[in-house]
């Protein structure tokens, strides 16, 4: 599958399989294994989806080596600040049964996102996360964010479709070498 090189050198598959609405554990595990068998190697989950354990079992049982998969998860808003974010990162790793995540995102830019980001930068430096980014952050907020962090986000995952094009955000990201990751293409 074709890949894109992020601003830190990590390569991400251009297509990913998201498990947002798959809440039944057995169904989630089966769907992820089926997705991997059909050629997806990027699996996108999040703490709030409450299916990280099922995704972890699928990773373990899919027959592929961990390094051949690209796993994304996200930090939810209840994990405000540095300490809560550090704990949440470790809990996601444990639930998924992996030693590292390929990509970890702030799911919603609310509350103490700077404390969350510091914890993510630390986990990145420790090798627990290969790439860090944000989600649902639009141009004005992203511009301010870049002035207050040490490591620039590699990705901004934003709901995008013909009705929500976010041209200003796309242009800002292009100028700042931040990849726009589209999600939820339906209106």
Report the location of each language-model feature.
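Short glycine-centered, acidic/aromatic-flanked micro-motifs in structured strand/loop junctions
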Residues: 19, 45, 73-75, 106-108, ...
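Conserved small/polar residues in nucleotide/adenosyl-binding loops
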Residues: 182-187
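Conserved, mostly hydrophobic/aromatic
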Residues: 17, 43, 55, 71, ...
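N-terminal binding-site loop/beta-alpha segment at the start of enzyme catalytic domains
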Residues: 1-69
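Glycine/proline-rich, positively charged
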Residues: 23, 80-168, 174, 178-181
């Amino acid at each position: 599958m074709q890949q894109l090189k992020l601003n830190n050198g990590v390569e991400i598959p251009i297509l990913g399989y998201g498990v947002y609405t798959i809440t039944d554990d057995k169904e989630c595990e089966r769907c992820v294994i089926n997705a991997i068998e059909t050629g997806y190697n990027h699996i996108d989950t999040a703490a709030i989806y409450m299916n990280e354990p099922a995704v972890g079992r699928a990773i373990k049982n899919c027959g592929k080596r961990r390094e051949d998969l690209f796993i994304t998860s996200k930090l939810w808003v209840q994990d405000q600040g540095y300490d809560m974010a550090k704990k949440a990162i470790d809990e996601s790793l444990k639930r998924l049964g992996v030693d590292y995540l390929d990509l970890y995102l702030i799911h919603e830019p609310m509350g103490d996102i700077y404390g969350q980001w510091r914890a993510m930068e630390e986990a990145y430096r420790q090798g627990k996360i290969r790439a860090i980014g944000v989600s649902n952050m639009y141009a004005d907020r992203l511009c301010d964010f870049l002035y207050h962090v040490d490591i620039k986000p590699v990705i901004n995952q934003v709901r995008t479709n013909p009705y929500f094009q976010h041209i200003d955000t796309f242009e800002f990201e292009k100028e700042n070498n931040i990849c726009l990751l589209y999600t939820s293409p339906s209106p």
